[in-house]
């Protein structure tokens, strides 16, 4: 999370879980962001290759992270080597105080928080969520006001540093930043038609921000 990076102390170690096998994901966009971080902030991002996401194949599932916090598995394994005291994740309010981005919950008392805070504690690490109280829209605003405003980009489907404009991330992150997207793409249409709507609060905001409310008339009463 670039927003989390901008809020955390300068001595924070920046690390990226690099999928190290052939897949649909393209790392050229994040790598350009890392280059900008080095040039504009004089900080380096530690890129650690991993095939961890293939573990799901053994269970008949698609490639992907095995749990909500598996994106930090590289840092858990290197915690002693890097002398880490904790690991921070860029989880926004849409997935903390708002359960699935739809309904309020007391996150501090939730099973999710108690379980994962406990698991990290057993490993001698603090479980840190620096933007747990900030919406995705708020996180985007933090990035817009930074030196990385032109460099930050969440798309992992683009090629040669250019975002694809067709994925869900492009819809709710690149679109609101004024970047060109295809709002009628198969993936965006599928997600907007899903019930319940994924990360509903932010999705509705993204529709309004881009004047695309007509794509989801079933939510007119919420605009």
Stretches found by the model and what they are:
Residues 2, 6-223:
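Nucleotide-activated chemistry modules centered on ATP-dependent adenylation/adenylyltransferase
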């Amino acid at each position: 999370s670039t927003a989390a990076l901008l809020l955390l102390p300068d001595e924070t170690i920046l690390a990226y879980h690099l999928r190290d096998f052939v897949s649909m994901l393209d790392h050229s966009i994040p790598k350009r962001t890392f280059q900008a971080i080095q040039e504009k902030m004089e900080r380096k991002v530690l890129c650690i290759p991993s095939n961890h996401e293939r573990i799901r194949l053994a269970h008949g599932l698609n490639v992907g992270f095995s749990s909500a916090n598996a994106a930090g598995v590289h840092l858990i394994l290197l915690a002693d080597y890097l002398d880490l005291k904790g690991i921070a994740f860029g989880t926004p309010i849409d997935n903390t105080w708002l359960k699935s981005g739809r309904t309020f919950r007391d996150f501090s008392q939730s099973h999710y928080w108690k379980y994962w805070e406990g698991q990290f504690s057993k490993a001698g690490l603090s479980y840190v969520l620096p933007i747990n109280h900030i919406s995705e829209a708020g996180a985007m605003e933090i990035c817009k006001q930074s030196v990385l405003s032109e460099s930050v980009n969440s798309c992992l489907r683009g090629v040669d540093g250019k975002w694809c404009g067709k994925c869900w991330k492009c819809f709710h992150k690149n679109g609101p930043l004024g970047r060109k997207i295809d709002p009628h793409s198969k993936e965006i249409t599928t997600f907007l038609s899903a019930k319940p709507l994924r990360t509903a609060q932010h999705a509705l905001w993204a529709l309004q921000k881009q004047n695309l409310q007509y794509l989801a008339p079933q939510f007119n009463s919420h605009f």
